[in-house]
Structures are given as structure tokens and as C-alpha cells.
């Protein structure tokens, strides 16, 4: 024992102050004595007897588990009861000790043990380290005491009542956990403990204080949460079951009424404490922690199975009433002014959590009924009432109709009995519900118009109802926000004309109030929404919002927003005083103009910015650039720091939402948390939220890969990451079809913000450029997001994905997301498979139909990928029947995407889907997708790709009927589709790097050569089939399918009325030419049938050359070498197949002279490349000279080459061929040599000189258009001048070249030798040669004045149309304005010198064109009407 004298002796002093231990003293005696079992038993009995008569029971119990006690403990005796025979002696010792003690004291043993045990428990709880919880050491001691107590209870040696009474004597030192341990170890129950307390009030206070401390520990995340939560749950169950038990409960007849009163009092105190704490707006106080720990008890799961349903309903109904009526100190006027601060998002999250839990247990219908009852019968706390209404409509969509019905009944009652309270209640509830946005409740403006804007409104019964309404609205004026008065003014109630004074009186009152508040109706913002819940913004801040919105709309549309245009006219004061100063705020202008600069410049050009204001703005910007603020960096840093706080709140809200995903019991509060996320998102975006994307007709995205601001990208990445994490968390518990509607709510939140374009931009970056680097969770999450965006497609605007290619048109969101998935390379194709597999699987699991959720293009891409990657999918297979589509394996870490894709392909549900034509992969779809493939980065090898093409074309699509997207066995149809899709691909934004001289490698890639090879193979098969199967008696061969495709596509493109259209048409023609070069050359010539020596059918090719290629694919007066050589190769091939090759060649080339002469001039230019091919093949095949027409071309070339020599042969016929050859020969000759050649022109025929002058004019115009070399231009001018001099010297009229028409029998064919642009620019050539005209030519030829005036008027029209604009002008060329000035002076000097007969047809010439130059026109008319002696100038100087 602690006071043993032997121990003190053993520890006494020794010779050197050292004391021996008891063991050391007995060491020697132990060795000397022999072991005697009988003596050992006697010693043990003597020791027990000594303890029995000298034991202090209180000290004994406290001694249990003392660390310093090395002797046998009481707990150890109990622990060994079942282990050895000494357990009976241990139990006997405990009982004997208490019996002996009770016998000496004369008290019952149960009372003694209870008192001793109570004092021991109190001693354990002394000096607690925690208000309600035991320390680890205290817990161990109490565990041993509980074991002793249970042993005594089993022997009927323990009085529970006495124990409880003894405990309460020192209640201030008792710990709640000790009481709980007594209850859980069945020593005494909580009910017994509470029932035995002598003072109900004191017991209630003690329990309230301990519950609050316990909740503080729960809210602060204590180290033993299981214990604390079990304690709180058990106590609450007891309080609810005893405080709200029904009167039919038989226990109420035998139990006193004191415990129910205490239970009710404690619950009310805790709720009142929570409401008071939340009203004080706590942050991180202990009271707030206590409230956060207490709120979760308001859940039906807490008392499930323990408390009866009636008791639970009674408790929650009582709780809702207490919430609504807690401290009703706010007046109605206070509620009208303050209710905007009580919206769901602005209310403390713990209070909304409390509302949500209570309302969820009661149900929407009962909750609305309880609200009605409380509002009618009691005074209420308007803050709690209105915040409860917000929670009701936000968290319980089914309650929205109930609230609308409630409001309707209140309004009907108000106007029936003129009940003002009902009117007040209805308006407050409506305004509160509208604070939550249009997705929850109609806007206040819409409700007000619906209620009072028609003849069926509540107020339309009588004059008394009108007076009642306007009296009520007038009473609201001093208290309500300006926003509501504006709604009443802009959307007034419908009032009969005889009572119109009531309305005007109210409007006057409201306008006066608005004026007092300094809110002007004229200064309402351009984009201000009268239905929004916020206050009227200051004009400056509203102007800032208007400017931001205007810039955003301008950036999307490229046009001045209509509200800005209207404001510049009808709301001039606001526009000039507020909008323009905000828009034109001085700043350092960016090097690359941003949308703000572009909008300002557009407004300036439209005269919407006064010059003085604009000049001041430019000067201020220049000053700002010179005085660059040094603190710009710090200002940006401050702005970034300010943005971090709302972003952190948004992150926290998203984390709370993810936590709810993993708890199925919390699904009821998910919608509330999504609303919190929406509010935090609004805070991050600031004023940029425009109330929803529904107001936008189209979203226009930039083509640049990184156009997001840093904050926007951070927010978007946060939202997308949260969505993916939420999906994985929710799917780890339940499949998609059993999940809560969190995803729909989340996506609607994204759709309702101005951030939606940023979300779509980020999705484009991720799916198009970073798809292969995304993890499995990201792929699954983004695929599910795409599905839900498709579900919301009706409420989303269309997307214009490319501002550089507006002709592509806008896309709905599902089609836009589908356009982001490409199949060009191995990585992109595999990512496309993964994404499509995830999206289709999720959609089939989540919904019953795919029609509204996914783009048909995505389904088709999935088919394309599966058929391409898996040969086993190409063979018919029996569909797999399963209860559901396999979604769960996809979100496992080791997802086998290929196996999942094949499994989905074989599912009967998916195969059933493919029976719908909308989702079936047709031949045209297959070609479009296959054109995207880049063979060098393809997942298939060359042989595998070839086999796949052969299977797809010849086994799948060629024999398939056209109704199923096939070709119906028609090779021509297969070729037509290939050609059309190749051309579409070449014109689309998927292809780039076009150049006129490049091969048909679409998009600058080699990926299309395989498809071109398939086209060549099919075209060759088609040519063989058509050659061997000619209809009997058919003399006119059918047109080639290729020209039919070209003709149809070119007709679809309008004539080039703009530069963009012209370029598109030119690009289309380049594609046509390249396809012609890829196919056999016989396509150009057509070819006679076997055994028929007739001319081949070249009409379609001639028509294409004359109408299209001559204008867009032509170098001056010739076609390009490739198409020219290709034509002659085709001609040779047709000749080789005919009976008389020379006849076919001669007839074809003779036809070219009249129908398509540009082919012959092209052959002359490229003769050096063409002659070896023609001569070599002709000699090898026929061993005979060239046909006559080919020799004519050969002779023309020889004539041009030997023109300067004395032995030059005479010019061959026709003269224009010789002239063309001569003109082309001079291209490569130096200027000095050309002069020598020109001296020999006098001996040539007139026809040759006229044609040569025409070709020289075309060369001059080509030098103007190309602008490559000034020397070449001077050379061209010299040639024209020399030829013109020769013509005038020989007195050959050349004016006819400037008046050519196709009906001209002699020279009309020359118009087919040059592009139309060159012939339109002949006036430019005419006056470029002004200095070359001889002095007498003007007077000598009567037609000269007519031609000169006509050319001048046409030159003016060319200048007006912009066709004289050149990239640069050399000094020798001069500018178009200078040329027009010279021409004008020339005419004004020429007109007086011309004889009267020169003006005979001048009236017709000036008809409709006289206003182009009034001075010239007047001079012509006066000279025409003047006498012969009349003269304007005595001595004209023409040159």
C-alpha cells in the first residue's frame, strides 16, 4: 500500500545515504527458503483478510490502473476471471469488501457501492482537459470503473437511483462523455440520469451548455469524431422521442411530465442559440463551430428507426415554426428594403442548410402549408421567412408551382376582401422568388405584366380594386428599390381610360421618388435588365457595363450594336455624357488593335463620335503613352490579388459540391449547393455576367489557339476539373442513370453565364489540341459534359467557330463539339475513339434516346473509327444483349478503351440506333472522314489502309442501295461523290497551303493521295465500262460526269461580285484543274468510239476553258503548261484509238481555231516542252509526219524564231497564229533585239499586224497587272508603240481592236484569246499609248474621237469600280489618277480640232454616261451644236 512502513524502511538512509529496495533485502532469504505450496496459500489468505479489514474503498477504486502501482490491480483480477481459478477469488474479494464495509456502516450494500462509485466517477472527471470529452488517461480509468460497476450490477449490489442522485450533487464537474459512457455500458441510461435530476431548469441549462460544447468539438473536427457524433445523435434521439411523443403513447401515462418539458426546452434553446449566432454573422468563432455541428441533426436519417414518424413530423413542424417566428422584430417596411440581401446565395450557408434539411423532411407541400399557417396566425421574422422561401424554390423544383399557387391565392384573397396583409405577403414572396433568377421563378417584370397588364388582371374588377392597387403601390414607394418602380413605370397596369388619372398620379409619385434618389429614367443603361434583382447602378458604373457589353457584342458580330445606335439618336444625353466618355477613356493603345479600338474606329467612321471628342481622345492616349505609369505592374498585381479571393470562394464551393457527390443522403441539398456555386461564379465574373446566354443569337469564337484571359482560363479550368471530379465521385457509388440531377444543374449554371464562350473555347483547345494528353477521368468527364450540353441545346445559342470563314455557317453546340474531334493522325483517331465511346456509353446509360443529346456526326465518327481499327467489326456479328451499356469499366483506372469500343459496337441497343438514317455512316460521310487521314501518321500501314479502302468502297458502299447511303452498284455515282467531297475538302477550312502550281495535295498534306488513287482506279474502271458498253444507235456521246460536277458547283457560286467571291471561285477552278490533271487525259478530249473516224467530243472542255479557265487559270493569253500538255496527251491517246489518227487530229485542232483558240496559243508558248512529246509518240506509232494542223503550229514557231533573219519564211496562215508565235518569241528577246525585229514588220500582212498589236496590248496589260519588273513594262510599251507606228505608217486602221465584239467575223475570235479582265482594261492600254499617237491620226480618222471618248468614259468607270487599283506604281506607269488627268486634257484639246462629222453618234455614246465628266460632256455637246467656224481653242497642243 502507499503508506506501508516497510516500504519506507526499505527506502531509508544507509551508510552513504543509499537505501536498498525491498527486493534487495529479501533476495538472500528467497534463496535460502524452500518452496512450500501450503505455506503460500496461507500467506495469500492472510493478505486478503488484512485488506478486507483495513481497506478504504474509495482509495481502492482510485488506485485502479495507477501507473505507479506495480502490485496486483483490481482490474487485473477482473480481467482474469475467465482465465484461471483465481477469478472467483477476485470477484469474491470485491463482493466481500463491499459487504463488510456496508455491514460496519449499517447501510445497504447497493447504496454504498453506488455512492463509492459516484465519488470515483467524480474523481475521474476532476480537472478535465476538455469541457465535455475525456482524456485518454481518464478514459482508461473510467473503463475500469465501468467494468466494476457492471460486475456489481450483475450481483444486484448497485443502486442506479442512488448513483444518479450522487452524481448530480457535483454536476458542474461531470463530463458529458462520462455520462454517455455510463449509458452505452448499460450502467444507467440517459433517461434515468435526466429523470433523476432534482432541478429541471438546472438540468436543462447543464444539458444545453454541454450540447453546445459538444457541437463546438464536432464543428472543429475533433480527433474522435465517431464518439462525438454518436453522443450527439443519441442525445438528440432521446430529446426528440421524449419531447415530441404523441399523446397516444402509453408511456406518457406512467412517466412524469418533467422530462418532455426539459427535452423541448433544450431543443428550443439550441435552435435559438443557432439562429442568434447566424444573425450575428459569425466568421470562425466557437459559436459558429457549435452551430455547424448542431445543424446536421435536423435530418430524418438521424432519428430513423428510433423516433416514430409522428414524433419526427411534430418536431420538424415545431422547428419550422420556431425558425419563422424567432425574434419577429423586423417590420414589413424593413423587409421591403432588405430582402435583396436575403437571397439564397447571400444568406449564410448554415441557415440555408437548416432550412433545406427541415423542408426536405416535411416535404414541399407540407412546408408551403406550414408557411401559410404561420404567416396568417403569428408574427414572423421576415428575414427567416423570405430566406426560407428562397431555399424552397431553389432546392425543391416541385415547390415552384406550389409557391405560384400560393401567391395566386393570396392575390385573389387580397382583391376579394381588400386584405392588405395578403397583398404584402404576395408581393414579398414574389420578389423574393424572382431574386433567384429566371431558371427558378419568372422575373418580377413578367409576373407584374401577367398579373396587371391585361384586362384579366386581379385589379380589373372595379374602380375599388384599382384604387386598392394604386394605394398599395403608392405606399410601397418610400421603401422599395428603384428597380421595382421602374418596372411599374415601364410596364404599368392596364387601366381604363376613365381611371387613367390613378395611373398618372402613381407614375408622377414614382418619378418624383426616383428623382429624389437621383435615378433618372433617361439614364437607364443600354443593356440594363429591369428584371434583375440588383439596385440601379450609378450612371458611371452602368456606363462601364454598357461599354463592356457593347465591345463584346461588337467582337462577336463585327457590327455596331443596335442599342448603341439607338442611344446615339434617341438617348443622346446618356450617350454623349456617359457612354462615350467611358468608351473613350484615355489609355496606352495596343500595338495590335483590340476590339475596343475597332469599335471606336467603326463609330468614328459612322459619324457617331463628334470630331472634337475623338481628337481629344487621341491626344489623351498619346499623352498616356508618353507618360507610361510606373505603377502599371503593381496595379495589375493588385487586380490579380483582388481576383484571388472570389476565386478561392468558388473553389471552396466546388469542393463542397464534390463532397456531396459521395454521400447519397445529401442528394437533396445538391441543387442548393449548385446555386451557391452559381453565386460564387457571379462574384468571380463581376459585372460581366449579362444574365444568361439566351439573349445572344450566336457565339463567335476566335480562331487563335490562346485567346482566353488568364482569369477566364483559370475559372474555366476550375469548372471543367470540378465537373470531371464530380462525375468520377458520383459514378464510384451509383451508375449515371441513378445519380442525382447534379450534372444538369451544373451545366445550366454554365449556360446561364457570359463565361459560356470561354468554356467552349477551352473545350476546343482541349479536344482539338490536347486530347491525347488527357487522362481517363478527363475524357469521361468531358464526354459527359458534351452530352449534357447537347441536352440543353434548345436553350443555347449557335456557335460560329471561325471568324475567318463565316461562310461555313454557325453550328449548334453538339455539332460544334463534334467538329473538334479529328481523325487525322494515330493519336487524334484513338482519342476520338475514346471520347466517342465514353459519350455514347454515358448517353445510352443516362437517357433513353440520343436524338437530342449527341450530334449525329459523333455517332458516325464512332462507326468510322471502329470499322477502321477493328477488322472484326467489318463482318456481320450477332448483337450482344445486356441490361445496360457498360459504363462502369470505363471509369476504372485501367480502362481498356478498345475493348469498351468493341463491346459498345456489338450492343443491340447501339445496333438498333444505327437503323436510323440520321446516325448511319453513309458513303459520303466515309469519304469526308477518310480525307482527313494523314498516311504518314496513320494508325494503319499502307497495306492495311489499302485493304480498308477496297473493303469500304467495293464491299460495303458500292453494292449498298442509295437509300442506305450507298452507290447502288453505280461506279459513276461512286466517282461523283469522290470528286465532290475532294473539292469540298479543298475549299473548306480543313485544307490550307493552296498554290497554283502545286499538285493536288489537299491541305498541304499527302493524306489525300490515297483517295485520289481510289478515284483514278474507279475512273479507269468506269472508262473501260463506258467504252465497251455504248448504247446502240447513240450518235451523241454522253457528257462526262466530271464536267457535270464542275458545272453544278460553278453554277452554285455566284459571279464574282466581290474580292472574296472571286477568290473562292478561283480556288474552285484551281481544284477543278488539278482534278483534271489527276485523271486520264482522255477525259478532256472525250474520244470517238471504236471504228468511228469522227472528231472527239471536246465541247465540254472548250466550254470550261472559254468560260472559266481562260479567266482564272491563265497567264495573259495562254493556259498553264500542265493543262495544255495534258490536253494534247489526251488528243494523242484518242488518235491512237481511231481509224484515221491524222484526220482526228486535224479536225480537233481546226475546231480549236474557232471554238477555243487559246489552246493553240498555249501550245505555241509551251511548244518547246510539247514538241518532243508529240513528235516522238507520233513517229513511234505511225512512222509518218505530223498531221497538218500540228505542222502549222510547228511552222509558226519556226517563222517566229527566224523572223529577224534574211531567210525567214513567210508567215503561215492563219495570221493570228503567226502573230501569237511572234509575240511569244519576243518575250525572251532583249529590248535591243526586239527593236531590230520590229523593223521588219512593214513587209508583213495587215492581218498579222492587227493581231500582233492585239497581243502586244495584252502583254502591256499583263505588265500592269503583274507589277513584277519596270523594265518589262517599258519593253511592252515600246513594242506596242512600234507596232502602232507601223500600222499608222501603213495607214492600217487599228481602232477596231478597241471596239471588238464576238459577232465580228474577222477579229471576234481574238476576244477568246485573253481573259475578260484584260479586255475590260483596254481603256487603260489605250491611254497608256497616248504619247504614241501621231498628230494627224485624230483628225484623219472620223472614228478616232468616238473611240477616244468611249475609252475615256470606260476608264472613268473602271476607276470608280476600283479595277485600276495596282499594288504599286512606277514612275513610268504613273497612277490611275494621273492617267485619267492626261486623258481628260487630251480630249478637251482634241474636241475643237475634230470635224463636225466626228460628232454624229455622240448623243448615243453619252446617253447614261454623261455625268461621269460634265465638262467633257458639255464640250462635246457644244461642239456638236456649234457652227463650223466655232472654235474653243485657236491653237490646240495635243502632244
From Swiss-Prot:
It holds the Pfam family FANCA_helical. Keywords: Cytoplasm, DNA damage, DNA repair, Nucleus, Phosphoprotein. A motif (Nuclear localization signal) lies at residues 19-35. GO terms for cellular component: chromatin; cytoplasm; Fanconi anaemia nuclear complex; nucleoplasm. Phosphorylated primarily on serine residues. Phosphorylation is required for the formation of the nuclear complex. Residues 1-20 are annotated as: Disordered. Mainly expressed in testis and lymphoid tissues like thymus, lymph nodes, and spleen, and at lower levels in kidney and ovary. Its main location: nucleus. Coiled coil: none annotated. InterPro entries: FANCA (IPR003516), FANCA_arcN (IPR055387), FANCA_helical (IPR055386), Fanconi_A_C (IPR055277), Fanconi_A_N (IPR031729). It is found in: Nucleus; Cytoplasm. One of its GO terms (biological process) is regulation of regulatory T cell differentiation. Belongs to the multisubunit FA complex composed of FANCA, FANCB, FANCC, FANCE, FANCF, FANCG, FANCL/PHF9 and FANCM. In complex with FANCF, FANCG and FANCL, but not with FANCC, nor FANCE, interacts with HES1; this interaction may be essential for the stability and nuclear localization of FA core complex proteins. The complex with FANCC and FANCG may also include EIF2AK2 and HSP70. Interacts with FAAP20; interaction is direct. DNA repair protein that may operate in a postreplication repair or a cell cycle checkpoint function. May be involved in interstrand DNA cross-link repair and in the maintenance of normal chromosome stability. This is Fanconi anemia group A protein homolog.
